[in-house]
Amino acid sequence: MSSRRNFIKKSLILGAGMAVAPGITFGSSNKKSQKLKIGMIGVGLRGSNHLRNLILRNDVEITAICDIDPNRNKLALKALDEAGRKKPKVYSNGEYDYRNLLDRKDVDAVIISTPWLWHTRMTKDAMLAGKYAGVEVSAANTIEECWDLVNTHENTGTHMMILENVNYRRDVLAVLNMVKQNVFGEMTHFRCGYQHDLRFVKLNDGKTAYGKGAEFGAKGISESAWRTNHSLLRNADVYPTHGVGPIAAMIDINRGNRFSSITSHATKAVGLHKYIEKVGGHDHPNAKLKFKQGDVITSTIETTNGETIIVTHDVNSPRPYSLGFRVQGSNGLWEKDGDRIYIEGESKPHQWDESNKWLEKYDHPLWQKYGEMATGAGHGGMDFFVLNAFVESAKQNIAPPMDAYDAAAWSAITPLSELSIENNGEPQDFPDFTRGNWVKRKPYNWIKNDY
């Protein structure tokens, strides 16, 4: 709860002027005259954070913004003006005005930060328009949408990147470095997920984004206006990529390995109902609703190379934040909860090491190079790195670290978990979104210091 509130406080700087640390500007790989022209589709709280970080770069220009909420556009314009940036073209004339933004010749790339149901169609439209697309998580809601992303990328040759920031968390990248250097031995098992009390996010009073009230949908504001309906209507892991994205990078999913099958189970749904009764009373209309999403959803994924991944979705109950990472191989393991590592032959037998000394030893080159300047970018610095990877990839018009095949495979967990739960935990096969090419695709080089 505190991490989200701290993020909101930083994002709201946009409404009161931009606090820019002196001397911090980013952008290096292309000539300064070759600025990447970016259109922002969605400048709510998440999109505004991306905008705040883009303003700090000297290699990009914001040429257009689009949001159906005129107030969000005004805040974005104010931030750009106070930073001495040119005024972009504004699009706010209905839900499909973003397509007019995509028609602009002075837009090379777009960043999509909108409600989930718009992610695939906007990303698809962007690729069809020849715009390099960055989309927030998750990228798709159905298997058909997953294929839409892959097919559109292949048919147009235009790239897209799923903007999964946790792949760039400092401890996650250090552990990735350990995996690639074979510290854990041959990898066998992983645990991850999204465990975060979002009751105060999914329900509010229609005036305050977080922390008050029992409304959602038409009577809600911010995320409660759209996110909570997924909990009402879908019994699925609707937000898997924060956990699965980093694990996929560690075991080269879609690049020599792939997800093969998934089984999922859900508990009963009580958390949101009890929260509504607590803050809105037993007679509140929303207290009469039956939410479909189980409070805790647990999925087990098998890979073609023989690893298993347990993924947990737990957002409707009182609990501290945790992504629940566990990374295990034949020589040892790391567990984030407890901040502990055990490496056979290095650790004392049957005793955990504190993780800090290992994470410092294997600190990732990216964090060694950019860590100090990335700290204020949002979410502990992760947002700087994921945005930097997007910008640098788009400037060169090359495949990003997390591409259309990754977006499809990771996002497919949602509909496949839903099907498995509906069928009493029956295993569901993952489509091969690479059409067999995962066998010969080379692993992405994550151990470098540029992006």
Question: Where do the protein language model's features map onto the residues?
Answer:
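Short beta->alpha connector loops at strand-helix junctions that form conserved
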Residues: 136-138, 164
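Predominantly a Rossmann-like dinucleotide-binding segment in NAD(P)-dependent oxidoreductases
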Residues: 42, 46, 156-161, 166-290, ...
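Short aromatic-enriched loop/helix-cap "lid" or pocket-rim segments at secondary-structure transitions
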Residues: 76-78, 173-175, 200-206, 273-277, ...
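Active-site beta-strand termini and strand-to-loop segments that position acidic
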Residues: 299-305, 329
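N-terminal glycine-/serine-/threonine-rich beta1-alpha1-beta2 phosphate-ribose binding loop
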Residues: 1-135, 147, 151-159, 450
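A structural signal for well-ordered alpha-helical segments within the folded catalytic domains
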Residues: 48, 120, 124, 144-147, ...
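C-terminal helical cap and adjacent loop that interface with cofactors, partners, or active-site loops
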Residues: 15, 49, 248, 318-451
